[in-house]
Design a protein with these regions (language model features):
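Bacterial N-terminal signal peptides
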Residues: 11-17
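Structured C-terminal subdomain patch of bacterial secreted/periplasmic proteins
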Residues: 245-315
Length: 315
């Protein structure tokens, strides 16, 4: 009889213990699934997962940020020609393309069932409501010279502040090395020119390359001062493109029109008469790295370009 009572008591205790264990696991799973943080962005305040697992990123500079922070997105926008950029391609295996930066594919995004979407107000404000209906959505503000601000924002959103601080410190160390090693070159007035289909632009202070040159300490020609974005010029204003050194880059979409514009202008007698051209100080650089990609990986590669040219004595 005593054995029977003891067995009954032990069985009851085991059952209670198992139920409690199951209850705790259920509670833990629920808490884990529902744990969110409030993030304030340019669109307001949003509740997002504390540690998102399935992120869709809608800007190319954002793609670079995520990869640098150790976060592989489930979906990302492609480069302007519909392919991954060469400098990030190897890290994007198995990532699903979701359209281009200026025209994300909402159906492709929804099919991935993301738990977080990261976009940009300048690019995606018109589809914000639709994105928000798919998953929690946050936006950086603009895409111009503010890549560092955006990078810090992405690090905050992804709960990767330590990784972000480390990456920026490494970038700034490279900047400081150039400043130190080539301090006698910092008075060089650098001109930035971009050729596009039907357009020629001078890139000013509030551009990706412009902010990096300023951070290093390089000067700009008198015609390229200030913090504006770009000046579009015709050949009658070619003198504004002159400088001690010129870096030019061409926005080519695969139809040959950007390259045709470059060829036309480079062969023009007025262009050839610029002092920077006559002194053989006009250098073509990669448009993706110096402008279009616009992220931390491109920034580091631009520094590498400058460092290499300086060490080779090109300017």
């Amino acid at each position: 009889m005593k054995k029977k009572i003891l067995c009954t008591i032990l069985s009851s205790m085991l059952a209670v213990s198992l139920l409690a264990g199951c209850s705790n696991k259920t509670t833990d799973a629920t808490n884990s699934k529902s744990k969110t943080v409030s993030i304030k962005d340019v669109m307001g305040t949003s509740e997002i997962p504390e540690n998102p697992k399935k992120v869709v990123i809608l800007t190319n500079e954002g793609v670079e940020a995520l990869l640098t922070l150790g976060v592989k997105p489930v979906g990302a926008v492609t480069g302007v020609t519909g392919d991954w950029y060469k400098h990030t391609k190897s890290e994007l295996a198995d990532v699903k393309p979701v359209g281009k930066e200026k025209a994300p594919n909402l159906e492709a995004i929804a099919a991935l069932k993301p738990d977080l979407i990261i976009g940009n107000k300048m690019r995606h404000e018109k589809i914000y409501t639709q994105l928000k209906a798919i998953a929690p959505t946050v936006f950086s503000d603009t895409i111009r010279g503010s890549w560092k601000d955006n990078f810090k924002f992405y690090a905050e959103v992804l709960n990767k502040k330590a990784e972000g601080d480390k990456a920026l410190k490494e970038y700034e160390s490279k900047v400081n090395s150039i400043k130190k090693d080539f301090k006698d070159k910092l008075d060089t007035k650098i001109s930035l020119v971009r050729f596009m289909d039907g357009k020629t632009r001078i890139y000013l202070g509030d551009t990706f390359a412009g902010t990096i040159l300023k951070e290093i300490g390089f000067k700009r020609p008198d015609t390229q001062q200030g913090t504006k974005f770009v000046n579009e010029i015709g050949k009658e204003r070619l003198n504004e493109a002159d400088g001690d050194v010129m870096f030019y880059f061409t926005y080519e979409l695969g139809d040959g029109k950007g390259l045709a514009r470059e060829k036309e202008w480079l062969n023009d007698p007025m262009f050839k008469s610029l002092n920077v051209v006559k002194n053989n100080k006009a250098f073509k650089v990669n448009d993706t790295i110096w402008n279009t990609a616009g992220g931390i990986k491109a920034a580091n590669l631009m520094l590498d370009d400058l460092n290499k040219m300086l060490r080779e004595g090109k300017f």
